[in-house]
Amino acid sequence: MVLNQEKLAKLQAASRTGGKGTPRRKMAPKPKGPGGEDPKLQAALKKLQVEPVSGVEEVNMFKEDGNVLHFAAPKVHGLPTSNTFAVYGNGVDKELTELVPGILNQLGPDSLASLRKLAESYQAMNAQHAASQAAAAGTKDDDDVPDVVENFDEADKKETEVDKLD
């Protein structure tokens, strides 16, 4: 029986299960679920003796640049006696315009100033848009009518002078 030495070597290498030179099996990574909270965070919260605050649907933190750090369904722990709260979850940077309808009751005096600026800029933008539309509509109508170049009274006088000369 004649066997190809290369095929035989491949079969032997594939059947090898242990010993020196064999590759190690890789462990499948375990997926971390939403319950996998940071142990350091939990230890720090335990030192502060904070308790979980339930019923918090969203948290909005207003920045100085006018943007809002928005947490949808965050986890909140707090100790009201020491005015200490921990908010953690996935925070997203959003502009104030994205949250305007539902955020009006949360605005304080500092944020009302930025809301006024936002409203003024929005009105100015609408005015510019309306002016550009009016200008565009006005230029369409003017294309059909030629511009008046000379005075009709002077042209009429010139014609009467020409008629007199003839």
Curated annotation (Swiss-Prot):
Disulfide cysteine pairs (residue numbers): none
UniProt cross-references to Pfam families, sorted A to Z: NAC (PF01849)
Domain of life according to the entry: Eukaryota
Stretches for region Disordered: 1-40, 129-166
Biased composition (Acidic residues): 141-153
Keyword Nucleus: yes
InterPro entries documented for this protein: BTF3 (IPR039370), NAC_A/B_dom_sf (IPR038187), Nas_poly-pep-assoc_cplx_dom (IPR002715)
Subcellular location as annotated: Cytoplasm; Nucleus
Swiss-Prot/TrEMBL GO biological process terms: protein transport
Main location: cytoplasm
GO cellular component: cytosol; nascent polypeptide-associated complex; nucleus
SMART domains listed in its UniProt record: NAC
Biased composition (Basic and acidic residues): 154-166
Domain NAC-A/B intervals: 35-100
Keywords: Cytoplasm, Nucleus, Protein transport, Repressor, Transcription, Transcription regulation, Transport
Protein purpose: Component of the nascent polypeptide-associated complex (NAC), a dynamic component of the ribosomal exit tunnel, protecting the emerging polypeptides from interaction with other cytoplasmic proteins to ensure appropriate nascent protein targeting. The NAC complex also promotes mitochondrial protein import by enhancing productive ribosome interactions with the outer mitochondrial membrane and blocks the inappropriate interaction of ribosomes translating non-secretory nascent polypeptides with translocation sites in the membrane of the endoplasmic reticulum.
Subunit comment: Part of the nascent polypeptide-associated complex (NAC), consisting of EGD2 and EGD1. NAC associates with ribosomes via EGD1.
Similarity annotation: Belongs to the NAC-beta family.
Protein name per the record: Nascent polypeptide-associated complex subunit beta
